[in-house]
């Protein structure tokens, strides 16, 4: 059985959530993936965040309750999955950039890039603004993996606020590609 991360987890400071999501398991329908890379987008002062320009129809979910999905389209063709963090009213979200997609066989597949994740899992804008703390088919779960070895780098693919080291990456995911699926929570 798996334990879905609760609202209290997402209500913490975004940088803490971003690093703590490493090693957690993203569940979407029948797919399971270990999160290996995240990026934080925090507040209205973060020029790279969608919330920089304030509250809009598109960014409303970022200002909402922690633990909700924020899915949007970039370049008119790639969906990106984020999860909202911080207390309601403060706009922040964590972008899921890379996962190890678990399968019955090893090695498991490394899926790097938020657009690739959404394409493979079939996550679309229809999955925007879903409470990931209450949905057993679309959530992030705790695992028994203890990830202490990660690095912080500047966020990538942006042109503003490039000085912020708000990208969190597990530098060597080789061991996760061969992880025994019995060591991670199972669906019931």
Swiss-Prot record:
Superkingdom of origin organism: Bacteria
Pfam families: Pur_DNA_glyco
Stored Gene3D superfamilies: Methylpurine-DNA glycosylase (MPG)
InterPro entries for the chain: Formyl_transferase-like_C_sf, MPG, MPG_sf
Annotated S-S bridges: none
Molecular function via GO: alkylbase DNA N-glycosylase activity; DNA binding
Its EC number(s): 3.2.2.-
Family per record: Belongs to the DNA glycosylase MPG family.
Protein's name in the database: Putative 3-methyladenine DNA glycosylase
Organism the protein comes from: Ehrlichia ruminantium (strain Welgevonden)
Lineage: Bacteria, Pseudomonadati, Pseudomonadota, Alphaproteobacteria, Rickettsiales
């Amino acid at each position: 059985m798996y334990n879905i991360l609760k609202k209290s987890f997402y209500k913490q400071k975004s940088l803490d959530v971003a690093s703590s999501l490493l090693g957690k398991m993203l569940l979407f329908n029948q797919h399971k993936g270990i999160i290996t890379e995240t990026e934080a987008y925090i507040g209205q002062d973060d020029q790279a965040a969608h919330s920089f320009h304030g509250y809009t129809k598109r960014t409303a979910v970022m200002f909402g309750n922690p633990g909700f999905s924020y899915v949007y389209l970039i370049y008119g063709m790639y969906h990106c999955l984020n999860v909202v963090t911080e207390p309601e009213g403060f706009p922040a979200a964590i972008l899921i950039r890379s996962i190890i997609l678990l399968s019955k066989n090893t090695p498991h597949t490394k899926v790097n890039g938020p657009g690739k994740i959404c394409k493979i899992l079939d996550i679309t804008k229809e999955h925007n603004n879903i409470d990931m703390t209450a949905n057993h088919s679309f959530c992030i779960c705790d695992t028994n993996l203890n990830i202490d070895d990660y690095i912080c780098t500047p966020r990538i693919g942006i042109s503003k606020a490039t000085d912020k080291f708000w990208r969190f990456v597990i530098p060597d995911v080789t061991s996760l590609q061969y992880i025994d699926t019995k060591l991670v929570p199972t669906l019931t």
